[in-house]
Design a protein with these regions (language model features):
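GST superfamily/GST-like fold recognition
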Residues: 138-160
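GST-like domain detector, emphasizing the conserved glutathione-binding G-site
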Residues: 1-138, 142
Length: 160
């Protein structure tokens, strides 16, 4: 995974590992088939020069389970065995109601589709608010991947 420091080329940032200006450049580098969607995040293997994953849920689990030797806090477990069923349940409604919910609103093709999507989104946000009014984190009293998955959408929601 290369960092993308700010670069002058058309207000794009440039990957310092391969000089890629666009995410598409990385997909082209690995010979992605025509019609592939160029999505992020990307977990990149520098040794093999390939995309390991572009699925955020898998990347979170991989980083949690496979990279402890590089972690500042290697004992942090975002998916502890005792909370897995709760985390999975929370992840399910957070994804459908919030993470994907904002896209359902943004890509609605009719007013009724938008109304349905925004209602579902705000029901899920109300649920988060109710949970966080009684406990510190969404899947219990410890920080888990459910919090990691929720955070970016909450942060981005206020800036759009």
């Amino acid at each position: 995974m290369g960092a993308f420091p700010a670069g002058p080329a058309h207000q794009c940032t440039v990957d310092d590992l391969h000089g890629a200006k666009f995410v598409r450049d990385l997909y082209d580098k690995v010979g992605a088939p025509v019609g592939t969607r160029f999505t992020v995040p990307i977990l990149w293997d520098k040794k093999t020069g390939r995309i390991v994953s572009n699925e955020s849920a898998e990347i979170i689990r991989d980083l949690n389970a496979c990279f402890n030797e590089f972690a500042e806090n290697p004992t942090l477990d975002l998916y502890p065995e005792a909370l897995r069923s709760e985390i999975d349940a929370v992840n399910e409604w957070i994804y459908h109601g919030i993470n994907n919910g904002v896209y359902k609103c943004g890509f609605a093709v009719s007013q009724s589709a938008y109304d349905e999507a925004v209602t579902e989104l705000f029901h899920a946000l109300d649920k988060v608010e109710a949970i966080l009014s009684t406990q510190r984190f969404v899947a219990g009293n410890v920080f888990t991947e459910a919090d990691v998955r929720l955070f970016p959408t909450l942060v981005r929601g206020g800036g759009q």
